[in-house]
Amino acid sequence: MRRVTRRIVVIALWGPKGGQGVSVTVASLALSHVRRSQDSVAIVDLAGDQPALLGATGIQSVGVLDWLASDAAGGALERTALNVAERLTVVPLGGGDVSGRDTGSGGLTPGGHGAAGRIDALWRAVDGLADVVLVDVGVPSARDGMVEPAATAGADDLRRAAVLAAANNVVVIRACYLALRRFRGLNLRCDSAVLVREPQRALSRGDVADTLDAPVSATVELDPAVARSVDSGMLVSRLPRRLDRTMAALADLLLVDGVHAAAASERKSAG
C-alpha cells in the first residue's frame, strides 16, 4: 500500500443538477483510494445520501448542519463522523438549522457568530478530518453569493460556498444539454470533470470539456453493475471492478493536483 498525500487535501465534488451521479462517484472514489493507500479519507456529506450509500444509516443523525447551528469547536465535527471502513469515515449532513433562525435550541448564533463566520469555521474544521477529505456537495445554489448570510443562509448556500471555498473542485456531469446549460447558469468554475457517459448521447467528451472550460479527468461508463451494487447495499463490499479501476486512476490524478493546489493556497495565505 502506498501513501499518496503529503498534506491534507480537500476536494469538492458537485453536479449542476440532480441525477448526475455525484454521491456514487464520491463514495466510489473514497472506497477505491482507501483500498490502495494508507491515507485516511473522510467524506463530508452536504447532499444527505452518503450514510445510506455506505451502509451507515440509523447510527446517528448529528452532522454538519448541527455543528453549524452550535458554537462547538472544530474538533466536535470529527466526533460526528461515522466509521464506514478502515480509515474511511463520513460526516453526515445532519438536521440542524444553518439559517440562524431560532430553532428552540439556540439557533446558529449562541456565541454571537453569524452564519458566514460559522461556515468559514467549518472549512477550517474540515481540514483536520483526514489525509484526504472529499466533500459531497450535491447541487449548489444558483444564487451568486450569499445575501444577508446571518438571516438567509441555508443548506443551498452552504453547498455553493463549498464549491467557492475549495482549492480543487470537480463537477460530475453527463453529456446532457440540460446539465451543461444548467452549469453555465450557475456561474461557477470547476477545475476538472468526471463525465458519466451514456450510450447514444450526441455530445462528445470534447464538447463537455469545451463547455466547462476544464479537462475531463475521468470517464465513467454507465454500468448496470453499479446500480445493482448500490440498490443491494453492497457498494462497500462489492465495488464494481471497472468503476474501481476508473476511480483509482482518478484518485491518483486528483491527489497530485490537490496537493499542488493546497500548497498554492498555503503560499497565498502566508503571503
Language-model regions, residue ranges each:
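N-terminal regions of ATP-driven nucleic-acid and macromolecular assemblies
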Residues: 8-10, 62-81, 177, 239, ...
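Short boundary/hinge segments that flank catalytic cores
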Residues: 1-10, 216
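Phosphate-binding loop that captures ATP/GTP phosphates
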Residues: 34-90
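C-terminal boundary of histidine-terminating zinc-finger modules
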Residues: 228-251
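Walker A/P-loop phosphate-binding motif and the immediately C-terminal alpha-helix
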Residues: 6-56, 119, 126
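Conserved catalytic-core segment of NTP-binding enzymes
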Residues: 117-232
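Flexible loop/N-cap segments at domain edges
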Residues: 76-95, 101-128, 135-137, 142, ...
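P-loop NTP-binding site
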Residues: 193-196, 219-225, 238, 254-271
